[in-house]
């Protein structure tokens, strides 16, 4: 155990590398005798930059290659942004650690305007997320929403070039890259409910590697795990992928878990919402309950229409 080398599969983007280096540092902090190496690689989601994510389709656009590296023995663990992680894992693999969550809110970024409310009619807002698009369109149907792909720096450069009046990014990514000064406003969940698992980092590895799973335990953050578990249970019941207009956000207050869920039509004309409070030990059933409420309101029809496209 003392001289084991752990190889971390990671995407090459600055944010993905930050996450992998964070896990590397935490592992060495917990187990100073370990050797931890990074194995950077490109994924399908990184390579296809000229198409909106929702149109590429499929689940796991940003993680499949990392899983192949583990299955071929080139890596031992994969570090993921939890909002990119599908509900189901390949046979033999599982999520064995969720690290402490960063701010899970969406961030409003603009060089001219202070908030969504301040944007003038017809202003151009950049985001590729159907979840963000449907909620912004619902709040401000007079705005023009345009797709925005690329890593954080690329997106900010497009804003600075004047292609957009504002862009919406995950606050966590900007904070981790020490770019929080670009954030004009943190968008409240009542305006834009975050994505499932947004702001949390998860670690995937083989289910049969008992020694490695034990080594990961000190990195797990139980509060974050409970919250993300509820959000993912809702998503699983809805059979949602990463690129669908689904929002889910759990808050923990003592032993009480409060989960809000949302499914919207991409044009923002329909926003279905549901919520549930319960004991944190019932995180999974709370997630399922919120999903069932949404399905009763017609969420299945919205999602089915999207999957047909």
UniProtKB/Swiss-Prot annotation:
Keyword Transferase: yes
Record-linked SUPFAM superfamilies: Periplasmic binding protein-like II (SSF53850), Porphobilinogen deaminase (hydroxymethylbilane synthase), C-terminal domain (SSF54782)
Molecular function as annotated in GO: hydroxymethylbilane synthase activity
Domain of life according to the entry: Bacteria
Catalytic activity from the UniProt record: 4 porphobilinogen + H2O = hydroxymethylbilane + 4 NH4(+)
Keywords: Porphyrin biosynthesis, Transferase
Additional note from the record: The porphobilinogen subunits are added to the dipyrromethane group.
Classification via NCBIfam families: hemC
Name of this chain's protein: Porphobilinogen deaminase
